[in-house]
């Protein structure tokens, strides 16, 4: 049976998740990139709860971006997520790229979060 690209991404993500785990002191920043939008959330894996989330679907962000699927949208999502997490007292995180390459929209989100004050 031939493995398609979605199954390959899921396999990569599982392999990374074996090594990356978020805690209360250093939660996991998880990024999911679809064809239309980008989603990011800060997760405490021990409790199994999402602490902070942001996405390009958010109505406040949609007014400032033209497309939800470009690097500009990813930068605004990263900046928004960092502002929300710092407001909650979360600065140090572990970055989980979700099986995607650290390139393009994923990289833009990560760099914007770093510039806004997050450490990973």
Swiss-Prot record:
Compartment(s) of residence: Plastid, Chloroplast
Main localisation: plastid
Gene3D superfamilies on file: 3.30.420.100
Keyword Lipid metabolism: no
GO MF, any single term: structural constituent of ribosome
Highest taxon above the source species: Eukaryota
Function: Binds 5S rRNA, forms part of the central protuberance of the 50S subunit.
Family: Belongs to the universal ribosomal protein uL18 family.
HAMAP family from the UniProt entry: Ribosomal_uL18_B
Assembly: Part of the 50S ribosomal subunit; contacts the 5S rRNA.
Protein name: Large ribosomal subunit protein uL18c
């Amino acid at each position: 049976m031939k493995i398609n690209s979605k199954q390959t991404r899921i396999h990569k993500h599982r392999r990374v998740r074996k090594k990356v785990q978020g805690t209360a002191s250093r939660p996991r920043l998880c990024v999911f990139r679809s064809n239309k939008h980008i989603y990011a959330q800060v997760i405490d894996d021990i409790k199994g709860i999402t602490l902070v989330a942001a996405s390009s679907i958010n109505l406040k962000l949609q007014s400032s971006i033209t497309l939800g699927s470009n690097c500009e949208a990813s930068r605004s999502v990263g900046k928004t997520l960092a502002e929300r997490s710092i407001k909650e007292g979360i600065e140090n995180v572990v970055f989980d790229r979700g099986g995607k390459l650290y390139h393009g929209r994923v990289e833009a989100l990560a760099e914007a979060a770093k510039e806004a004050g997050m450490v990973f």
